[in-house]
Each structure stands twice: as C-alpha cells, then as structure tokens.
Amino acid sequence: MDEAEASLLRHFPLLLPQNREKTVYEGFISAQGSDFHLRIVLPKDLQLKKARLLCSLQLKNILNEYHQVVQQRMKHSPDLMSFMMELKMILEVALKNKQELCVQPPSCSFCKDLLTEIGAIGWDKLACVESSFSTIKLKADDASGRKHLITVKLKAKYPVEPPDCVVDFPVPFSVSWTPQSSLVDVYSQFLVALETLKVFWDVMDEIDEKTWVLEPEKPPRSATARRIALGKNVSIAIEVDPRHPTMLPEFCFLGADHVTKPLGMKLSGSIHLWDPENSLLQNLKDVLEIDFPARSILEESDFSMDCGICYARHLNGAIPDQVCNNPQCGQPFHEICLYEWLRGLSTSRQSFNVFFGDCPYCSKPITLKMSGRKP
C-alpha cells in the first residue's frame, strides 16, 4: 500500500476499492455526524477529469445546489484523496446551510411569553422583530430627545441563557442576568445606561452643531473622537472620556508648526482655567481664547482640505493630516501621499521614521514623521 492509499484509508476509512485496479471505490463519506453513501468510478489512468461520482438520493439532494462546484473540483483535483477532502468540505458547508434554513420555529409558549414581555415594555417601544422571534429591536429616547436602539438576540435556551445585546454606546454594555430575568430587565438596564451617557452625548452634540468636525463626517453615538477645524489648515483632534466628558480630553494640534505651537503654549498656560462645570467646548474656547469658526465661514474663505498630491479630501477613510510648515504655503497632504512623494525623490533622505525633502507645492523643505500606521 503506497502513501496515497494509506492517507485515503486514514481519512476515509468507509470508502474502499472494489477491484484490483482500484478504479472503483464505494462506501460512505462522513460529515456532521452522518454517513452518506457514494460510488466513484475512475478511468484506467486514474485521472479525476473523466471520473464519475454516483451519490445516494439523500447525498444528491444535499449537494444539488453545489453540483457545478463538485464537478469543477473533480476536474481540477490531482488525485482521489484531494477530491475527497474538497468534497467533504463542500458537504460540511451544504449541511450547515441546510440546518440554518431548517431551524425549528419557536414554540407557542415561547412566543406567548415573549409577547407578554414586549407588552410589559410597551408596544410603542418595539422597533422590529424577526419572524423567528430570535432578534428583537427596541427603541428609546433619552432625556435630550435623542433616539436610540438596542438589538436583543435571543439564544436557543432563553431565558436560561442571557441574550446578546448590541447598542451604539461608547462604553461596553453588559446585562445583569438570571434565569428569571426577561426583556423588561434588559430594557430597564438600557434606559439606565442612556441616562449615564446623557452628558457625554450633550457634549458631543454641542461640538457637532457649533464647530466644523472634519472627522468623522457622520459620527455614530459610540464615537469618542473628533477632529475640529480651527482655521486655515489647522485643527485639533480630541478624544473624550465618555465617563468624564467635561474633563480635559486627550488632544493634539494638527497643522504647521508656526500655527500649532502657539496654540499648544496657550493651552498649557491656561489649563488652570479648565472648569468641569462648563461644557467641553466652552472650556476649549476659554483656554485657547478662540471662537471655533463655523463650516460656512471657513468654506467661504480660501480654506482647503484637499490633498496637494492626490487632490482628494478622503483617501482610505483618512483626510490630510500633514501640512507644509512654510507660512506662505501651508498646503495639506495625506501622510501616505507625502510618503510616496518623498520616497520617489532622489534628493530626499530618511532618518529612522522621519523623512526630509521638498514640498511638492512650494519646494521649501518639508519633514514627514511617519505614524505607526503602515503606508
């Protein structure tokens, strides 16, 4: 017995040769705990290209939608062992898909209990329910009138097993659960969480409404970061703590050094003025001694956020965050665009993760310090 035959017997012990030439194999293939009868007839040269696969009616029905895939794999498999491994993989996928389509409908008592729980919450709070009753979406308004959704995914052993809950929160949301708990308990905890996050969302909404937020363009409720335009090619990136939203956030200024350095010095010198009783935006105005310009005002000026190399604002989800330090230029660039530009110049040089070269716009010296992101 050669190595190929031994491997076939080891992986498929129920499939045996029916003649000395080993051109006919018959037996069973196992998948998902079941055995399926099949017969494979090979030509004299044992090439799979001209082989025939004969299946039991049960196996034929399961593989019906995968007929072309099976034929293709048979045609391209180098030997019987390779084909059988691929056939088993296809069979596993087919059985899994069939099981998902044949999920048992919920019992009448399960549906009745679930409807009672939804009624206790209030039918006006129901946003959506799947026909299988496995996924339920509930809605709520917070104290500021913002609308929120919670998606509750019930498991097979509900209520013994806790459901999975999906929310658009900036912090983890875990449900306290016992076998006696219900949707009412989930919804109550959801409302409590909304109340604890009210101040955070108030802070973020004020920033979104009263400043020009460069990133993200359409922030979800879970977003804790904002990049805010301060003027021509200068911005501030902040990361807000959802649990302490009026405290000093993590921040960094983005732009040319001659603009960002004075702002950094001003903030450092006025940090003692930060008052957690005020909103985050008001505190930023006080310590920076500026009024955040509205988008309409900046767009009417010569403010530009397009990259000076690719001429686009967004590239792979990022906006330009590198700026020429020449006060007469100040052209913004995407990091990856500037990296590729400098790398292509024979006159540029590199020291560790810092590149030195000439600005594509004004030809003055420009420096690029690569971030941790891969270009």
UniProtKB/Swiss-Prot annotation:
Q: Which CDD domains does the UniProt record give?
A: DRWD-C_FANCL, DRWD-N_FANCL, ELF_FANCL, RING-CH-C4HC3_FANCL
Q: What SMART domains does its record include?
A: FANCL_C (SM01197)
Name the gene for this chain: Fancl
EC number(s) for this protein?
Answer: 2.3.2.27
Question: Where do the record's region annotations for UBC-RWD region (URD) lie?
Answer: 104-294
Which disease relates to this protein according to its record? Answer: Defects in Fancl are a cause of the gcd (germ cell deficient) mutant phenotype, which leads to reduced numbers of precursor germ cells and adult sterility, probably due to a reduced precursor germ cells proliferation.
Q: What is this protein called?
A: E3 ubiquitin-protein ligase FANCL
Compartment(s) where it occurs, according to its Swiss-Prot or TrEMBL record: Cytoplasm; Nucleus
Looking at the UniProt record for this protein, which Gene Ontology cellular component terms does it annotate, in alphabetical order?
A: chromatin; cytoplasm; Fanconi anaemia nuclear complex; nuclear body; nuclear envelope
Highest lineage ranks of the organism? Eukaryota, Metazoa, Chordata, Craniata, Vertebrata
